[in-house]
């Protein structure tokens, strides 16, 4: 790269200023430091007066009323305005909301709106608390997977169910170079720091390449300190949200009366 091109493309100088500098017709150029962007403050989306729409949506996805009501009662799930998104709330140890994941209830071509609320801290991700003291935490890639697995387990409240807010994994068959793929999830690290009573980690990531990769990395990192239980969905390529929805549809077909011929 030429000196002129370097000054223009890297230092951001104007062409004329760069030429003058190289010809020693102007004083040395000192690039200005860009100001650090301040992180916007976190604020929960406004609540709607009820949760009727998100309850219907989650029911359709195979999530039981019992599980939905449990989450609403713990103030970690509600319906927002004006778009009626399902809001999954993550809290810190003082029960202060520090994270929110929004999931749209209207889908187009099988895809719906999903985003983390501005200012969210992923280390305080969505977590369903147990009914009583426990030594186990189950970890999932997404909030809805936690609700789905709880539904499939008949609404058991015997462990924490923590969403990791997504996972970092390389593409299949890619050469692994970045250490970021091997870093333990922030949400799980923060949770374990604040819950020294935990002795067991149940890994419930998706049964695809990324989920299996994440499972192996967590297993390597925590094995020896914690008892590791690997509990991925039995179906290849599926997550627990898929299985809950499939079970809902299967039950619907089973309960449908036979048509007369």
Question: Predicted regions: what is each one?
Answer:
Residues 133-138, 199-202:
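Short active-site oxyanion
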Residues 141-144, 207:
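Helix N-cap/beta->alpha junction signal
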Residues 9, 146, 150-154:
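Short active-site loop/helix that positions an aromatic residue
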Residues 151-261:
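TOPRIM fold recognition
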Residues 35-131:
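Basic, glycine-enriched DNA-binding surface that flanks or lies within the catalytic cores of DNA
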Residues 7, 58, 141, 149, ...:
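Terminal peptide-recognition signature
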Residues 1-60, 260:
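Non-catalytic accessory segments of DNA primases and related replication-initiation nucleases
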Residues 139-142, 166-168:
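Conserved mixed alpha/beta catalytic, RNA-binding, or beta-rich assembly cores of soluble enzyme
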């Amino acid at each position: 790269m030429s000196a002129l091109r370097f000054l223009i493309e890297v230092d951001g100088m104007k062409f004329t200023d760069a030429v003058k500098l190289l010809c020693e017709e102007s004083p040395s150029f000192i690039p200005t430091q860009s100001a650090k962007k301040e992180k916007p403050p976190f604020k929960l989306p406004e609540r709607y007066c009820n949760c009727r729409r998100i309850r219907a949506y989650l029911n359709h996805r195979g999530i039981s009323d019992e599980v939905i009501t449990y989450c609403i009662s713990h103030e970690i799930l509600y319906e927002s305005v004006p778009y009626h998104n399902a809001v999954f709330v993550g809290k810190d140890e003082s029960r202060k909301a520090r994270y929110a994941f929004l999931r749209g209830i209207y889908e187009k071509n099988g895809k719906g709106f999903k985003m983390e609320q501005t200012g969210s801290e992923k280390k305080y991700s969505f977590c369903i608390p147990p009914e009583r003291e426990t030594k186990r935490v189950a970890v999932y890639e997404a909030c809805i997977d936690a609700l789905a697995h709880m539904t499939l387990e008949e609404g058991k409240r015997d462990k924490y169910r923590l969403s990791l807010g997504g996972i970092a994994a390389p593409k299949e068959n890619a050469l692994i170079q970045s250490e970021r793929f091997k870093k333990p999830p922030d949400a799980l690290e923060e949770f374990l720091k604040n819950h020294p009573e935990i002795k067991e980690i149940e890994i419930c990531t998706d049964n695809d390449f990324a989920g299996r990769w994440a499972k192996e990395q967590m297993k390597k990192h925590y094995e020896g300190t914690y008892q590791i239980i690997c509990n991925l969905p039995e179906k290849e390529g599926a997550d627990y949200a898929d299985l809950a929805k499939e079970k809902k549809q299967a039950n619907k077909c089973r309960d449908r009366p036979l048509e007369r011929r």
